[in-house]
A protein has these predicted regions:
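Conserved SAM-binding loop of SAM-dependent methyltransferases across substrates and taxa
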Residues: 121-138
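Conserved S-adenosyl-L-methionine
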Residues: 118-120, 148
Length: 192
């Protein structure tokens, strides 16, 4: 079994390769001082594949252009930090500036489409949906598209299932009981 140090050591040419790989597939810029991110986040992939080091992982990626492993590397380097009503000032601006304007400009069409890029597990997209419903847009045709580089987090978003700790983080109690139903230790979005 290789030591943790041997797994984590990255030769400079491999570090540059990883930087370029992540940038070209995700647009994420990882500066020279981010070795620790590669080391901590790629070590589990190295172990899972039975490799001896991150350098071996780079060799595999360069030699085969293995798309599944390449995707795992990119997903490992993304930060899936999200919670309900993250950045309250943003939601205030949506309520007080954007929605009144959209209501005026789209009154005849009554259709709105939003894109939640880097949606992670969906809390921010669902927060937007709740804002729209609370602000009287329930009879409008609303579409919110959530996208993310990570397939597993998108699957979680689609499920609409959240743990208690996740709903406690930013979600007002009144909206929790209005838009979610409890199921054991979890909360599921209802069809409101």
């Amino acid at each position: 079994m290789p030591s943790q140090t041997s797994i984590a050591e990255i030769r400079s040419e491999n570090y540059r390769f990883l930087q370029q790989h992540v940038y070209s597939h995700a647009g994420i810029v990882l500066e020279e001082d981010k070795h620790y991110l590669f080391e901590s986040r790629l070590a589990p992939i190295v172990k899972q594949l039975g490799l001896n080091s991150i350098n071996d992982l780079c060799t595999l990626l360069m030699a085969t252009r293995e798309t599944q492993v390449g995707r795992q590397v990119v997903e490992a380097m993304t930060t899936n930090e999200t919670y309900f009503f993250r950045d309250p000032a943003q939601y205030d601006a949506i309520r007080t500036v954007l929605l009144p304007r959209l209501r005026r400009e789209r009154q005849n069409m009554r259709t709105l489409r939003f894109w939640s890029a880097a949606a992670s597990t969906g809390q921010e997209a669902y927060s937007l949906a709740m804002v729209l419903l609370e602000d009287g847009f329930s009879d409008w045709n609303i579409q919110i598209l959530g996208t993310d580089l990570s397939s597993p987090v998108l699957e979680r978003a689609r499920s609409g299932k959240y743990q208690q700790i996740e709903v406690n983080r930013g979600l007002p109690a009144a909206l929790l009981v209005k838009y979610f139903r409890r199921s054991g230790m979890d909360w599921h979005l209802s069809e409101a």
